[in-house]
Amino acid sequence: MKKFYNIKSQNNITGIYIYGEIIGGSDKWDESDVTFDDFKKALDTMNNGDTLEMYINSPGGSVFTTQGIVNMINRCKKTKNIKVVSYIDGLGASCASWLPMVADEVYVYNTSMLMVHKPMSSLFGANANDMQSEIELLNKLEIIGRR
């Protein structure tokens, strides 16, 4: 199975190719999915002053997994003084648009798209209390996404 991400290291540069959906740990069905732990393993190998290059072509995915990745990258920037460079190779949509927001440099090609939207969800068989809880969660996620 082909992974949607690929990690390459060369001369103090670690490249992470995010080409597919960002999946929560409980949703991982096969090796093509990636979780927070997959990114943690890559960033744990980086040394002080290294550069992380993120190549993004993703429709998004799990907002909570993405937020965990964003927080981990921010922590690594502070503790290891890494530089983060982001390239939107094709599509950086939905929560995948959060990843370049933590970069020191962002490159978007003329043929690429960065799509930011309000958080979305779906409910089935929900009552008014369930819907109100979901509204509150979506409002919180929107505030988090603005940070």
Could you tell me what each predicted segment is?
Residues 1-147:
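Terminal-region recognition feature
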